[in-house]
Amino acid sequence: MLKSSLLLFFTVTVGLTGCSYRYYAGDLQPLSEAEQGENKEVADDGSVTYNQARLAITLRPMTDAELNRQFSAYSNQGAESPNPYTFGNSEYFRTGDTPKRWTVFRLNVSNYEYPKVYLDPERVYITTSNGRKYYALNREQLSIYYRRYAGGGSGGDGPGIPGNAFITWKERDGILRKTMYPNEQIFSAQESQGYIVFEPLAHDVQLLTVHIDDIVVRFDYKGDPVETTDVEVLFQREIGRVYPDGSKVANNSVK
């Protein structure tokens, strides 16, 4: 009886171990030009550009590796790295995977068509094919997140963060100020660019649409909007499972 129980325990344990897995998700890639719709161009670097005469709006998903290279001096201290867009060069124990801190897009607007154009970065949002919705985060929200992440913060002008944690918080906030997409008008023959930040996508998100709504392209004499346009950009990524032996199975495959 004891031998039978031990054999059953061993069999169940091995079976559970063999079936264990973790989720993975690849980098975001744009859908084809045919799927994007009219007036869209898809470039080799993964960016999608919407053209309305000489107004060009370009959106490109950023990988953590790219963001770490761009802020290389601020990405070598693991999770404590001042890079506000990633966890730096940190890795999960044993798997070697890099944890995802945010979902980041680079937005570029080039206006050579209208007297002025206005795009509110805080109104950009994501919808997914499985019913999820993500709203863009502003700098104040990210600053509060990092103030709490550092510990000891109480808000206001004196956050109460001690020592090196305060320095790291200020470095992160400074990078965000300089690199997030600015909330300002773009006058004729001007360009504006910066990052749009969202919460990390859930592991089951495969197909998504980035909505850039109510882009103002014409104003009346009082400065009120009289003509707007909406832009939608589609991206997808491979998702699936990774098994203990390192094999990957995409969500449409059968293990």
Show where each model-derived region lies.
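N-terminal secretory signal peptides that target proteins for export/translocation
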Residues: 1-2
